[in-house]
Amino acid sequence: MTDSIKLEIEQLRQTLRYHEYQYHVLDNPQIPDAEYDRLFHRLKTLEQQYPQWFSPDSPTQRVGAKPLSAFAQVQHEMPMLSLDNAFSDEELHAFVKRIQDRLVFSPKLLEFCCEPKLDGLAVSILYVDGKLTQAATRGDGSTGEDITLNIRTVRNIPLQLLMENPPTRLEVRGEVFMSQAGFEVLNEKALARGEKTFANPRNAAAGSLRQLDPRITSQRPLLLNAYSIGVAEGIDLPDTHFERLQWLKSIGIPVNNEIQLCEGTENVLNFYRAIMQKRSTLGYDIDGTVIKVNDIALQEELGFISKAPRWAIAYKFPAQEELTVLNAVEFQVGRTGAITPVAKLQPVFVAGVTVSNATLHNGDEIARLDVAIGDTVIIRRAGDVIPQIIGVLHEKRPANAEKIVFPTECPVCGSVIVRIEGEAVARCTGGLFCAAQRKEALKHFVSRKAMDIDGVGAKLIEQLVDREQIHTPADLFKLDLNTLARLERMGLKSAQNALDSLQKAKKTTLARFIFALGIREVGEATALNLANHFKTLEALKEATLEQLQEVQDVGEVVANRIFVFWREPHNVAVVEDLIAQGIHWETVEVKDVGDNPFKEKTVVLTGTLTQMGRTEAKALLQQLGAKVSGSVSAKTDLVVAGDSAGSKLTKANELGVKVIDENTFLAWSKPYL
């Protein structure tokens, strides 16, 4: 009996290690999470019942150790060196030339192993006879802190290597990090508990690893990607860096999936550019690429200089955060009258572009930052996000710094600015009397997702409003060739193109028309829901507050915005004028889609869809009765993932949300179209 129990314990450990490897390293889960949990629970129960067969490398031993009073110091047998940095193509070319000049026999085209530079915490993990024995931070490169108990809680780090005859000693070096999706979930949970949140995934990863209580670390979504081997005894390692990383992967150690061999400098630069473009879709933070000579013999020949190897370099991405000076603040007026403070900055190069303006959002943000004109500020620009001020160096504040005073009157029309209780935004009360609001409302009306009037752009609208030739959207359809041709940079041909676009735009859809009206908080999706629900403009106009709230995703606030819009005589007059100018659409027909896979489900779209646009897919889902959300959460039922899906897909996988591809989405929806 006891032998059979012992055998079952060993088999359970092997099975769980296998599935941990499949899940965490190969990203290829073989069994449902519930089945893994069942096996794990069975093993834990047996180990409690038969403590004589306890093993420190069992999958059950990742969590539960007592808190430490302090971290012990660990002396690294081989120094954990940092890398020199390159910040331009020229510096990378110089790095390659230095290598070629130093080598006795240098190949014409050197082969490099290239990988993303993860923004995490460097660690060293020692395996003795295949078992995880010690782990340490890099520290100063010579001495680090003992974080063994914490590293044992990281789910994708094996406690035992997956191989028959493991090395006597093997030191794995890598980066511990946190995915963007894991970081979001961690901060959401912290907010729900009223706790302090982390500023970014790197801080979260570093703070989690340096917890004195490993039980806290075990609750954090940490991951490891190995990038090199340190000490190795009792094993003949492969002769290239790339092959060593693939070998690590084969024995259960996770490595990055984007690693690539590149021959020659141009291919290295192509890799750098490709990864920089792919950066926003990876699902984790990186700040550059790491380029290493692939041949280990050449690495040894090149050796080290000071605290960095001669055979490797980090080619950093342009900084996403920089320091600059706030020179002034201007207050802009938006389509709905929102007053937005815009920071005028001393120009600074951030994330590949020169930034001279940044948003300050609203008055509350100005107060929160305690920012003044003349301050040295931290600017952040990431991807396509509008640059913003995220911090102030108050210790550098000059004696002549000026307090930012939020206006009480509109800077464009002089109307009173009010702030409704419960809203962060202050607004101009001038309505369409305000030229700024009029311009933005008209720009919205002609935009691609609204009336889609190609030949009428922002510059043309600004001229027409400034010359008081248009006041409402209906006035656009009353323009003639001579009026347009007399405008700057127009001419007869451009004027005729604009008139043709206006004529073509007269045939639209009810949903587009509703969206084009610019009712506050009525976006594309809500406009489509309103059109599908009421089917006619007249029915929408006459709807009560209660009837409006029966529409999908229309709550009390949005219903009130719509209701008030139709009670304003000026708005009704403009709409009637538009209809009189020939705006029309086909009758809305909503098919009975019955029960289908998407009905009453919360669905998230992510990545690039190749067979239809994102807006079209969103509309289709809503027609099928789905609620389309912009973010993944525990309440999400389904994620439709297109090409280059990023952090939303990662978060869906972490939360166990069902994911389908575009072809499956189309196949499921086709029978109901």
Swiss-Prot record:
GO biological process: DNA repair; DNA replication
Magnesium keyword on record: yes
Catalytic residues identified in the record: K117 (n6-amp-lysine intermediate)
InterPro entries per the UniProt record, alphabetical: BRCT_dom, BRCT_dom_sf, DisA/LigA_HHH, DNA_ligase, DNA_ligase_AS, DNA_ligase_CS, DNAligase_adenylation, DNAligase_N
Keywords for the protein's UniProt record, in alphabetical order: DNA damage, DNA repair, DNA replication, Ligase, Magnesium, Manganese, Metal-binding, NAD, Zinc
Principal EC category: ligase
Pfam families named among the record's database cross-references: BRCT, DNA_ligase_aden, DNA_ligase_OB, DNA_ligase_ZBD, HHH_2, HHH_5, Nlig-Ia
A GO-annotated cellular component: cytosol
Superkingdom field: Bacteria
Catalytic activity: NAD(+) + (deoxyribonucleotide)n-3'-hydroxyl + 5'-phospho-(deoxyribonucleotide)m = (deoxyribonucleotide)n+m + AMP + beta-nicotinamide D-nucleotide
Cofactor(s) required for function per UniProt: Mg(2+); Mn(2+)
EC number(s) per entry: 6.5.1.2
Binding site for NAD(+): D33, A34, E35, Y36, D37, S82, L83, E115, R138, E175, K292, K316
Domain BRCT positions: 593-673
Annotated positions binding Zn(2+): C410, C413, C428, C434
Record-linked Gene3D superfamilies: 5' to 3' exonuclease, C-terminal subdomain, 6.20.10.30, BRCT domain, DNA ligase/mRNA capping enzyme, Helix hairpin bin, Nucleic acid-binding proteins
CDD domains: BRCT_DNA_ligase_like, LIGANc
Family indicated by similarity: Belongs to the NAD-dependent DNA ligase family. LigA subfamily.
Protein name (database record): DNA ligase
Organism per entry: Pasteurella multocida (strain Pm70)
